[in-house]
Every structure is written in C-alpha cells, then in structure tokens.
C-alpha cells in the first residue's frame, strides 16, 4: 500500500510510478511491466509495436493543431537493478516494493527503488494519459534489459522509429542537461580448481563483510566507495595458510560490491591472528573510506569443514584479485575536473565447488584510452591461468554542444527557472550511445529528476524535483 506521505502532484506521474513499484521488473523479466504499458496504450487508443528483442514503441498522436510538427521520441528502459540488504526478505520476481517517505525522499525498504528508470517510464506514460499536455506526435520507446548489458538498445529494430529528436529521461540530477555518455565493456574470468581436504590441523572459517554503501559503478565510481571484494582480500592477505573453499561477493557488473563472504581453511595460529586484526582493519578502513561506508562490519565465524583449493592456487587467486584495478583511472582534461574519463569496477566473485567466476567491467569515453587498461587486466588474468570471456562493448555518445535541441532546451530552462542549466556528459552507459549509432541523424538530450544511491538499497528519489521536471518536459514538448 502507499505510504501516508506518498506524493500526489503531478498526479499522472506518481500514479504510474506507484503502479510500476507493484510490478516486478528485473532485467530480462519485463513481460509483466510491458503488459501494463500496452494496457495503457490500448486504453487510450494508441497503436503499439514490439520488436524481436522485446522493446516496445507506443505511438501517441499529436495534440490537435500539432500534427505537422516533427515526431519526438521519448526513451526509457523498463527494467530495474535488483539489489537488497542481506537481512531483507524480498523476491524481486514476485514481490511488490515496500515504499517509504523520509525527509523529502521516496525510497524502498532495504531494496532498490527502481526510480532508475521507473520515474522516466512513469513520465512517458503520463504523456500518454494526461489530456492536458500539448505535444507533437510522440513515439514512446520502452527498452528492455538495460541494466545487464544494454541488450534492448543493442537489439532495437530502429525501423520502428520515425522521429529524429529524442528525449532520454534516464539521468539523475535535476537542473542538468546531458549530451554525452560513456561506452563500456567487460569480462567474466573463470577457472575450475581441483579441491582437496584441508591441511591437517586446519579449521574452516567464514569471513563476512557487510555495511558498505555500494552504488552505481559509473556515476559514483569517483566517490572512492569501499569495494567489498578488495577489502575482503586485503583482510586475508596476511593469512599465510589460507586455502579457499567458497565465496560470494557482489551482485552485478554495474554495482560496486557492498557485501559478501569468503569461506576458507587455515591453521589455528593464523585464525587467531586474523581475529585480533579485525578491529585494526576496520579502524584503518574508517580512516580513509567516505562516511557512507562507516557502517561496515567485518565478521569471522567458524564454518563447517569443507574441501578447499590448494595453498598455491589460493595464494595465486588472492594475489590476482588484489592486483586487479578498481575505481577511477583517468579524469577529463576538457570537462569539469570531476568527470571520469576511464574507470573499472571489480564487481563480483563466485566460488562454488571449485568453479570460479570473477567479473569486471570498464567505462570510457574514448575506447583508445581504454586499450592499456584492457591489456593490464587481461595480462593479470592470464598469469593466474584464468579463462577470459570478453563481454561485448557498447558505444559512447559523443557530446554535440552545437545541438539545436540543446540550445532550445537551455533557453527554456532559463525562462522557466531563471537559471542556466549545467550541460554535462555522464560517466555511465546510457542507451543514447547505442541509439545514436542506430539513428545517426538524431538530436538527443537527456535529463531527469534527482536520484541518489542508484543500483543500491539506499536508492532514493527527491520528491521535490519531480514537479519541476514534469513542468519542464511538458513545456519543452509544447515548443518542439
């Protein structure tokens, strides 16, 4: 049910967003939410088409008198990142979200909210259902599988679209207009390790780390947030007799890992020394990690005896994880100093019955700049005997500061809000880069209300930014 303080203005956006929070919509499981959009289209006598990938386009006729204006594409993705805290019982494939309002923010109870990109989807649906909005012909493009590799945009049948002006509503800082985004690529490293009984006299332990902030591996990578995988490996670095048994750290390629555990065997002396080091490790991390990470906990618990990797293989794997880069690698010389040009996210580790999977991803504006980082990462993986599977990359969106759409949007913002909007590129993989490659003559702009903590259980939407966002969107459409 809606929390008592659930916002009501603008009515159409908030009602659609609430309905979207009732419908499970993980990546690659968007059928139910797509059915909701189709139902809205049919209820308002709008034609729609579906491509082979599952992307949906709804064709909204122009307001009376606007029929000859150029068609505008409104683009959003249907899926959401599905992350929860370790103590939260929630099935993202079945359960609706539990909403809360705190200090002017809308959030979910210990799960992602899906405002990324649900609030944009809600705005697109509001354009369909609000009879008071004046607009040209619209093509509402709802893509799928954005969060796990931009699969919907990559597979889009562009022949479904006639518009050459596009508004993407998937950025997260109000009063900012985005005209460029990073490209990306990644790897999954794997290996099967033989297992053996733990050495005589060894005991089994589980080292768990929780309480980090985590977050978006693009727009928050420059914040120097703690990486649970790097910290766990650092904690085990001095355990000379460590033999790995199992591990689960991180959830997805585009999420900075916030919690996880590693199970291992070691001799009694090493276990005792590690137990004594836990508080010192946490104090050291607190001394340099941002305040958002100061809730971290490091717990060492006895575990049931288990088969383990050899001492040599365990050392080798821990060393390669310690050596693999993570975080911002280069900053722009042309844009504001906080714009990251090149980054890498060491995202996920799974070890189950000797089977290793290790995932990492990079983001970049210039693919040539990423070549050296790619070489370094793959060289480390080869030294550790890991099988390398490259994840297909996607293009960035090169900024066009001479865009006619941008000029009109800036002027409108100044008139409506008496302020000059910031014009930026974003270090994240918006679908705009792929869509621009499919529609090379399209003029594209991205904006949205304020969201914080995307891709984490602290994701929240600033309620007060939604009314001016809606006012701006509808005013811009009235001018196009």
What residue spans do the PLM features occupy?
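Fold-level recognition of mixed alpha/beta catalytic cores in primary-metabolism enzymes, strongest
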Residues: 136-228, 236
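A structural supersecondary motif
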Residues: 241-251, 334-350
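Acidic/His- and Gly-rich active-site-bordering loop/insert found
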Residues: 4-105
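Active-site metal-coordination/substrate-binding segment of hydrolases
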Residues: 66-164, 314, 325-326, 332, ...
């Amino acid at each position: 049910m809606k929390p008592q303080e659930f916002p009501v203005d603008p009515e159409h956006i908030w009602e659609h967003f609430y309905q979207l929070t009732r419908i499970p919509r993980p990546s690659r499981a968007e059928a139910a939410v797509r059915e909701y959009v189709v139902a809205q289209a049919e209820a308002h006598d709008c034609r729609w088409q579906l491509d082979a990938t599952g992307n949906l386009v709804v064709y909204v006729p122009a307001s009376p008198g606007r029929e000859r204006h150029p068609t505008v594409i409104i683009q959003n993705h249907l899926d959401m990142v599905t992350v929860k805290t370790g103590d939260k019982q929630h099935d993202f494939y079945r359960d609706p979200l539990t909403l809360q309002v705190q200090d002017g923010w809308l959030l979910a109870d210990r799960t992602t909210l899906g405002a990324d990109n649900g609030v944009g989807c809600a705005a697109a649906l509001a354009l369909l259902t609000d009879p008071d909005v004046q607009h040209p012909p619209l093509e509402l493009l709802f893509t799928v599988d954005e969060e796990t590799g931009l699969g919907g945009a990559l597979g889009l049948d562009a022949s479904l679209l006639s518009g050459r002006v596009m508004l993407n509503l998937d950025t997260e800082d109000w009063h900012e207009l985005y005209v460029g985004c990073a490209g990306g690529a990644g790897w999954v490293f794997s290996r099967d390790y033989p297992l053996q009984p733990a050495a005589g006299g060894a005991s089994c332990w589980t080292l768990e780390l929780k309480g980090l902030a985590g977050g978006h591996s693009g727009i928050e990578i420059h914040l120097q947030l703690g990486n649970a995988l790097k910290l766990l490996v650092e904690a085990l670095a001095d355990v000379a007799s460590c033999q790995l048994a199992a591990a689960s750290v991180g959830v997805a390629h585009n999420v900075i890992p916030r919690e996880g555990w590693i199970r291992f065997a070691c001799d009694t002396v090493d276990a005792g020394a590690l137990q004594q080091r836990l508080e010192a490790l946490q104090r050291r991390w607190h001394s340099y990690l941002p305040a958002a990470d100061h809730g971290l906990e490091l717990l060492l618990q006895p575990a049931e005896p288990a088969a383990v990797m050899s001492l040599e293989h365990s050392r080798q794997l821990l060393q390669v994880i310690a050596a693999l880069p993570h975080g911002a690698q280069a900053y722009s010389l042309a844009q504001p100093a906080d714009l990251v040009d090149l980054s890498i996210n060491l995202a996920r580790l799974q070890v189950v019955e000797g089977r290793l999977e290790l995932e990492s991803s990079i983001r970049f504006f210039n693919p040539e700049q990423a070549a050296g980082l790619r070489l370094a990462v793959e060289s480390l993986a080869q030294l550790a005997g890991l099988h390398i599977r490259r994840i297909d990359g996607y293009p960035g969106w090169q900024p066009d500061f001479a865009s006619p759409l941008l000029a009109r949007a800036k002027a409108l913002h100044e008139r409506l809000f008496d302020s000059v909007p910031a014009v930026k590129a974003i270090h994240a993989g918006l679908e705009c880069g792929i869509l621009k490659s499919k529609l090379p003559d399209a003029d594209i702009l991205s904006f949205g209300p304020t969201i914080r903590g995307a891709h984490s259980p602290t994701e929240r939407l600033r309620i007060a930014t939604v009314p001016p966002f809606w006012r701006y969107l509808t005013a811009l459409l009235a001018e196009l």
